[in-house]
């Protein structure tokens, strides 16, 4: 039987020996997205993703679907801190509902993409596969840390500080890969079944 230890976190309780606990701020560097609005959008140019797309129903949170990309002038390319590199995350910093607090996208690829309006970017410090965190960030248990601290009445605000202070549980790298590969395969299987059902309708 696997030996367990207390994580010190209310939302998870015990974790296996060999797993670690850390805060987001020690794993990522935060930055703001571009100060652009709908008025700045054009047909083609520099790809951006803003909070509206992050809250989209087609956003899985674990990759960036092509349909979520919008475009602004290439003049914005000079704002390098707003650029999403491979293994980075983009969180929406506002949400109209409690459930949307913590919504994000994970950038798995090398293609060019910038964070847009109302976006907090997490730049990966180690610059390595963060699929495990992408899946962790989708769980209600993890998001409870964000939701309980988000402020607002009609619109909830999710600040860089709130995200930075959130804790994560970290398995060894090989276990992260096993978890991520398993979930990737399951999600692909579900997507395939969903597509088949839609064809039959």
Question: What residue ranges belong to the model's regions?
Answer:
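Non-catalytic DNA-recognition/assembly elements of restriction-modification systems
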Residues: 2-38, 165, 169, 173-177, ...
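A short glycine-rich beta-alpha junction/loop motif
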Residues: 4-7, 38, 112-119, 128-131, ...
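Periplasmic-binding protein-like
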Residues: 142-145
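A short beta-sheet element
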Residues: 50, 75-138, 157-159
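Short amphipathic beta-strand starts and helix->beta connectors
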Residues: 105-106, 149-152
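Sequence-specific dsDNA recognition surfaces
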Residues: 7-8, 25-40, 52-89
């Amino acid at each position: 039987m696997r030996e367990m230890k207390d994580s010190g976190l209310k939302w998870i309780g015990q974790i296996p020996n060999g797993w670690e606990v850390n805060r987001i701020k020690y794993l990522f560097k935060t930055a703001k997205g571009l100060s652009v609005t709908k008025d700045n959008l054009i047909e083609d140019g520099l790809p951006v993703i803003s909070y509206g797309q992050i809250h989209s129903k087609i956003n899985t949170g674990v990759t960036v679907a092509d349909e979520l990309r919008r475009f602004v002038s290439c003049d914005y390319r000079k704002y390098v801190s707003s650029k999403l590199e491979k293994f980075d995350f983009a969180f929406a910093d506002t949400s109209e509902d409690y459930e949307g607090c913590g919504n994000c996208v994970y950038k798995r690829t090398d293609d060019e993409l910038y964070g847009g309006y109302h976006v907090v970017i997490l730049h990966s410090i180690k610059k390595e596969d963060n699929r495990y965190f992408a899946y962790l960030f989708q769980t209600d248990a993890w998001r409870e840390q964000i939701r309980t601290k988000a402020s607002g009445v009609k619109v909830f605000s999710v600040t860089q500080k709130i995200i930075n202070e959130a804790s994560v549980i970290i398995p060894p790298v090989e276990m992260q890969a096993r978890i991520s590969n398993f979930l990737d395969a399951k999600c692909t299987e579900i997507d395939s079944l969903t597509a088949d059902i839609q064809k039959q309708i």
